[in-house]
Amino acid sequence: MGFRINTNIGALNAHANSVVNARELDKSLSRLSSGLRINSAADDASGMAIADSLRSQAATLGQAINNGNDAIGILQTADKAMDEQLKILDTIKTKATQAAQDGQSLKTRTMLQADINRLMEELDNIANTTSFNGKQLLSGGFTNQEFQIGSSSNQTIKASIGATQSSKIGVTRFETGSQSFSSGTVGLTIKNYNGIEDFKFDSVVISTSVGTGLGALAEEINRNADKTGIRATFDVKSVGAYAIKAGNTSQDFAINGVVIGQINYNDGDNNGQLISAINAVKDTTGVQASKDENGKLVLTSADGRGIKITGSIGVGAGILHTENYGRLSLVKNDGRDINISGTGLSAIGMGATDMISQSSVSLRESKGQISAANADAMGFNAYNGGGAKQIIFASSIAGFMSQAGSGFSAGSGFSVGSGKNYSAILSASIQIVSSARSISSTYVVSTGSGFSAGSGNSQFAALRISTVSAHDETAGVTTLKGAMAVMDIAETAITNLDQIRADIGAVQNQLQVTINNITVTQVNVKAAESTIRDVDFAAESANFSKYNILAQSGSYAMSQRNAVQQNVLKLLQ
């Protein structure tokens, strides 16, 4: 090998290798000091792109977890508020149950209603004030609210919370048929009871025998209430049109085939003859007699069989119908119609031509005065809702007009044939009660009769003995039937809140499962990113040692190579 001075190839090679070693040593020191394998795109462009994507996904999943926890917090806030509302509803139902017995007076029931009103106010207060970050939760506006729970857009869970105000919950369906005055066999079917199928009940005979009538039908309906969601009550009751007046029954007077015979009774049945005689055979007839607060005779079927009077109970008893099979009331714990069909429905007052009183009543509506329509649908009235029935004593219209004190008798200026149509006055629908039978005909006021409110003939209003019609009822639990209705409505409200809470619980569980899943996903994504981005300290330490030694040996080699060139001087000595 020749000696050259101008170009030191060995030194140049040593220098080049030293530069590479120094660069690699710098990279190794950078990795060891940062803990990252990739500190710049030059380190691993493809790996950096993948790692950045994974880092973004992990960060997004972390926020999604926070979103899910926020959603759970919202739902838990609503759930706890509704738990308090349920306690209020339990108390309302308990107080309604307390009022649903005739040991309570109007005064004590009014006190109970006042308590219920206060409880409803607090229930509404909870519904209107429960909020999260300024958003109302229980007022009905929190519907289809979305929570992002994924790393990509539109990966959401929706949550809705139903309204819980007293005007929105407890909506209960009440339907009561017309008064039934005929017997028969009923085959009742509930249409689409579950939204798809029909439910057919076993046929029931409506008659006056034991084990028949609306009581037997109600028992059949209630036996299947868990499946259909419909419960039934019955009211088989004949109420006198006026306070008991002196009279007598016929010798063949009988109730439900059991002969009671002739009884003489005085005004108000003060001697107790009529009521005692009827109650003496109540275990056989199934019919019990009593007087209401107005002194009217009340015949009540204890087991729901019909009430059939044969012979004559006497006009003084005021019983309008000698055959009565009562009214059937249906209750459903939601506001949807009860769609019925079947055979023999006229025997339960629910035939095609019968008037069925229907109403959906919310919890708030039970707080104030119960309207006539709602009261009739709830089964308050023993008779069908509608126009008033005027009850007077006479053998006929002409006979009535001829009676002294009628206002149409001699010298009054009015007569049957006066051309004024006074033979048709008897306001809306007047029942003429003769001394021989219970009811004659119904008459309607003729136009131009001159007999109306404000007509100047108002003195004739004194001839009205009684009015039987649907009318408004006092608030809530202030009546026995009202208390029963409030129990039904409170039960519906409890069911409504339980359903809302169940929906909330389902969403909470869904969110929790999602959070658990994306937490695991986030861990795995971070692990994948770490595998790509983070440095392996064991391998990198070995790598650092390698380049550190090479750097030192390179410096030594370069020094030695420069020293070799000094040998040229020896040739010149």
UniProtKB/Swiss-Prot annotation:
Recorded family membership: Belongs to the bacterial flagellin family.
Protein's UniProt name: Flagellin B
Function, in words: Flagellin is the subunit protein which polymerizes to form the filaments of bacterial flagella.
Main location: secreted
Pfam family membership, one: Flagellin_IN
GO cellular component: bacterial-type flagellum; extracellular region
Domain of life: Bacteria
Annotated GO MF terms: structural molecule activity
InterPro entries in the record: Flagellin, Flagellin_C, Flagellin_C_sub2, Flagellin_hook_IN_motif, Flagellin_N
Keywords: Bacterial flagellum, Secreted
Quaternary organization: Heteromer of FlaA and FlaB. A flagellar filament composed exclusively of FlaA is indistinguishable in length from that of the wild-type and shows a slight reduction in motility. The flagellar filament composed exclusively of the FlaB is severely truncated in length and greatly reduced in motility. Thus, while both flagellins are not necessary for motility, both are required for a fully active flagellar filament.
Localisation: Secreted; Bacterial flagellum
The keyword Heme appears for this protein: no
